[in-house]
Structure formats: C-alpha cells, structure tokens
UniProtKB/Swiss-Prot annotation:
Keyword annotations from UniProtKB, A to Z: ATP-binding, Ligase, Nucleotide-binding, Purine biosynthesis
InterPro entries linked: ATP-grasp, ATP-grasp_carboxylate-amine, ATP_grasp_subdomain_1, PreATP-grasp_dom_sf, PurK, PurK_C, PurT/PurK_preATP-grasp, Rudment_hybrid_motif
SUPFAM superfamilies assigned: Glutathione synthetase ATP-binding domain-like, PreATP-grasp domain, Rudiment single hybrid motif
Gene: purK
Subunit structure: Homodimer.
GO biological process: 'de novo' IMP biosynthetic process
Limits of the ATP-grasp domain: 112-296
Organism, as annotated: Staphylococcus aureus (strain MRSA252)
Record-listed ATP binding positions: 108, 148, 153-159, 183-186, 191, 214, 266-267
Protein name: N5-carboxyaminoimidazole ribonucleotide synthase
Function description: Catalyzes the ATP-dependent conversion of 5-aminoimidazole ribonucleotide (AIR) and HCO(3)(-) to N5-carboxyaminoimidazole ribonucleotide (N5-CAIR).
Associated pathway: Purine metabolism; IMP biosynthesis via de novo pathway; 5-amino-1-(5-phospho-D-ribosyl)imidazole-4-carboxylate from 5-amino-1-(5-phospho-D-ribosyl)imidazole (N5-CAIR route): step 1/2
Alphabetized PANTHER family for the sequence: PHOSPHORIBOSYLAMINOIMIDAZOLE CARBOXYLASE, PURINE BIOSYNTHESIS PROTEIN 6/7, PUR6/7
Amino acid sequence: MNFNKLKFGATIGIIGGGQLGKMMAQSAQKMGYKVAVLDPAEDCPCRYVAHEFIQAKYDDEKALNQLGQKCDVITYEFENISAQQLKLLCEKYNIPQGYQAIQLLQDRLTEKETLKSAGTKVVPFISVKESKDIDKAIETLGYPFIVKTRFGGYDGKGQVLINNEKDLQEGIKLIETSECVAEKYLNIKKEVSLTVTRGNNNQITYFPLQENEHRNQILFKTIVPARIDKIAEAKEQVNKIIQSIHFIGTFTVEFFIDSNNQLYVNEIAPRPHNSGHYSIEACDYSQFDTHILAVTGQSLPNSIELLKPAVMMNLLGKDLDLLENEFNEHPEWHLHIYGKSERKDSRKMGHMTVLTNDVNQTEQDMYAKFEGSN
C-alpha cells in the first residue's frame, strides 16, 4: 500500500461515533492514522477507540469547526447530518465525500427521481404531500403499496404497508405528519446489495454481491456470495448511479429482485453498510479499509478477493440474551460487539461472521441458533 497522499500520523475526523465510526477508526489506526470523533453520546462506541473525542450535537457549528481544525480529513458514518451544515464544512475543510450525496439521499423523493433520471430501474413511485393524494397513489400504483416519509426513517421506521382499503387510515396518519412517497409493493424473491468504493481518481472497487434477509425491517443475515447471478446487472446499475451522484469512499446500493427475476434499485447508503460487515474477515480488504484508502487519497485495490464464502448475522439485544453463553464454545464465530451501553431487544449490539465451505448448511445452523431451536 502506498500512503503518499495523507502521511502516517495524520488525523482523520469522523462525524458520528456509532459502530460504523468505530470500525472506520480501527481501519484507520492500523494504517497509521490518528482519529478524532464527534458524537453527542458520551458513551458512543467509537469514543473508546479514538485518540480524541468531542461530545457535541451534529448541528453544533462550533464543535464541527473544532473537529475540522484538528483534522487533516473528515468523513462521516451516517446520512442524518444536515446537508447544509455539511456544505458549509466542505467550504473550509477537506471532506472528500462532499455534501451532494447526502443532500440527494436524505429526501426519498429526490433519491428516487435522481435514480430514475439516471436510467436505473426503480419501483414505480409517486409523491404524496397531503392526505388527498392517497387516492392518486391507489389509482397510479394499485394495492398493495408502501407509504414512506420523505425524510428520516431507517430500519423500517417511518413507513406503512397499505394492503387494502382497511389500511388507508394508517397511511393517512403518516401523510398528515410529514410529506411522503408512495411506492408499489413488490413480490420480492430476493434482496441483494452491492458495496462499492470509489476513489479520488475515479477508481472503482466492487465487493461481491451480497444476499440479504431482513426481519422486521432490520438486517438479519447476509450471505456472500449471493446465490443468484445478478452481479453484472448490479454493477451496470451502479455505473449509471455514479454518473449522477458524487461518491468518494464506500457506499452500498440495495436492490430488490422480484418474482419475475427483475432487478430494481431500492436505496443507497452513502457510507459503509451493515451488509458489508462480513468483509472484515471474508475479504482481503474490508469495506472500512477501502473507505479509509479512498478518503485519504490512496490507490484502491483493483479488485476485492473473497477469501471464503461467509454468513454474517446481526446480533440484536435479544440475540445476545439468547446466545451470549455460547460464544466461547464457537471460535469459528468471528464476533464483533460494538460496546453500546444499553442492551435493547431490537437494537444492533454487534454482528458475527462465519466463514464456511457450505453456506446452505451454515445458514440452517444459524437459523436453529437464532430461533432458539437448538
């Protein structure tokens, strides 16, 4: 590796001190960089692996400038920072990711319109600004469809499935609280995602196609490589996206595959993503390694080698309650506990990756463990 752009000992600032920030910091440190993190939570996971911690809200202009003055480059671990605040920071400090992607992707309507104009295949959608617009959604999309808030929402929050007329009132309640987008509900055969890193010189590195399973709108499991031949098609869609949206660093595009085997772009995460965590053990570079290489101006690997097929399981609070006593009996479970102070049933507390020669058998073993049947 050649680190002739940002020298050893330089400081990387991270806005956001959750598990993604923590894993970014760990990659940065093994490459010889120092890390400063800003987060409002006194006990955020990244604090305990950073060289310097600034406790402040994400819209605290003074604290953000303090971070900028201390750091040679700034990155962010999530997309809920104010795009306008980020734009102002970009004018003064080195933030390779920029603010444009955040500005587009914070608004689901703008995201979908941008994806559509880029020529990607997206699920049919319509803007619903007020409750009377729901009639137009029924006429345009037909049942079933999903109503989602334009702003905010993650892990399934801020959305309502409308199966029939009986569900309309729940959708109207959501529309009355905020502007929304309605989109056609697909009969989904499989969910996949593609994690990508783009460097300053427009170099692009692709990770293997990831096959995902969600439960209650939270990622439950990722299998790599995906058990469906869609990698070329997914790359083609990503290549269209990066012509329209500025990305530097690691990002992930999530896709639906419907019952007719059609691939649709669902949404984009403009930073490292939960479905890419397997790469820490299963690939020669992790998604965090390539992210740090990109934002520090280094060359990216030409390709990512999958060292071994893998099954990655999210660990929610309820999973820790179920499995905590078994961890020491399974050294093949590569365990990552994020260090969050409060355990909650549906909160992401960690993840684990199992390298395997038989993903189907390992998948069944994990189902048995996580569903408490073995």
